Amino acid sequence: MPAPQLHLTFGMMVKDQPGIHPALRRACSQEPVYTRLGAIFHDLPYYGNMLAEAVRYGLGSPALDEPWAYRMHSVRPERFVASFIAAAATTPGPLARDERLALVGGLLSHCALDLTLHPLVNYCARRDTEEHGGHESVHHRLTEKYHALFFHLERFGRDPIGTPDFREYSQIVKAGSLVRARVEAPIVQFMRDAYRGAYGDAPDGDTWAGWVRSFRHFGLLVSLPIAKRNSDLKQRDPALRPRYFENDVFRFFDFYACSERRVTELCNLGYDYFDAGDFSTAAADAFVRAARIDDLAEPGLVYPELLAALPPLPRLSVRCTPGITAPPGNEPWRKRDRRRELRQKRRAARVRRLG
């Protein structure tokens, strides 16, 4: 997934997209907190233990597998989006229409960004894994970090990392604090309805509230001056921008242009589905067919024509992640990546147990 600061910024930019229905744009403008919640909703499970994850990140350790995040990104992601919109519209409680629509706009911005930028993130991460070794998830996170850094510098002239503004960005519910894992009751109910509609089960409310609080801890950490110094250091590195953002092979903004088109399409489809108030199986099926939401982690597995519509990227050599970019039958990496395959199988088994 793109970096959290990019997801949050892109979610907040829904209000400025001229092609999106005015009611949805207004909702995202009026309810920035719930827009940000929707924009980061898919990734919240990754923040279950912020201190441990920060240590792992600093040590360059592989990212932890998180079954709930894997489900939302790769196990019927289109059904989860349909369930999320239905829950936003129907969950009882004192939620205003704009609050409900802001959740929808934020979530669809996340989907649009993943579907259009993840192919580029995956390419860069696998390129660097091939060239430098190490675990792909480490290179994946670095790629996301530099994409977000140079995007913010190009678009806004400043990086939000290391600034007090980012503490506010990381507030994604209206209750709770850095200390208390507390979320307003209607949002907890909405969360559980969204998960259950797609998967039949949901995280415990206290667990999910802990993820929300932990995300605020993340916001506090990356708003500190030490994060600003690191950002300034990376901005002065002449090798990073041409490697990750713009070179003879790709331009980040060519992919980002697709993100803006996709978010307009998805937000209008999502608004129509929300506004119609029909959440029957037939209506959900119609929304899913129109939205064409692919695997968010590996776009193109379900709708290869949408992947083909993105700017082209070179095919990596056969020494790459199995089953992703390598031609079928070419398996010189087999022994090297056997452990990776076993990890994937264990992760899939955990997801099945959750189901």
Locations of the language-model features?
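N-terminal leader/auxiliary helical segments
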Residues: 1-106, 111-355
